[in-house]
Amino acid sequence: MAKHLKFIARTVMVQEGNVESAYRTLNRILTMDGLIEDIKHRRYYEKPCCRRQRESYERCRRIYNMEMARKINFLMRKNRADPWQGC
């Protein structure tokens, strides 16, 4: 087995013959890396217009999720100024 980080990060050891948990772990790693979605998209030919639409949608969704996470983190801060001081 290669000592390259790319291969180490996607290597799962089977402990005590427990193949199911190792498979679930490997599946989770591949999903988090985005490889499962990439393989699904490359399985069949995707027309260029559909690919542009999908990539545009994914880009917009990524921006939306980042902004929403930023807003939620701002709201979850404890030391922010109280906006309703007079009430």
Swiss-Prot record:
One annotated GO molecular function: structural constituent of ribosome
Q: What is its main location?
A: mitochondrion
Check the record and name the InterPro entries matching this protein. Ribosomal_bS21 (IPR001911), Ribosomal_bS21_sf (IPR038380)
Record-level GO cellular component terms:
mitochondrial inner membrane; mitochondrial small ribosomal subunit; mitochondrion
Per UniProt, which keywords does this protein have?
Mitochondrion, Ribonucleoprotein, Ribosomal protein
Report which superkingdom the organism of origin falls in.
Eukaryota
Gene Ontology annotations of biological process type: mitochondrial translation; translation
Cellular location(s): Mitochondrion
Spell out the subunit comment.
Component of the mitochondrial small ribosomal subunit (mt-SSU). Mature mammalian 55S mitochondrial ribosomes consist of a small (28S) and a large (39S) subunit. The 28S small subunit contains a 12S ribosomal RNA (12S mt-rRNA) and 30 different proteins. The 39S large subunit contains a 16S rRNA (16S mt-rRNA), a copy of mitochondrial valine transfer RNA (mt-tRNA(Val)), which plays an integral structural role, and 52 different proteins.
The record's similarity note reads:
Belongs to the bacterial ribosomal protein bS21 family.
Question: Which PANTHER family does the annotation name?
Answer: MITOCHONDRIAL 28S RIBOSOMAL PROTEIN S21, SMALL RIBOSOMAL SUBUNIT PROTEIN BS21M
Protein name (database record):
Small ribosomal subunit protein bS21m
Q: Which gene encodes it?
A: MRPS21
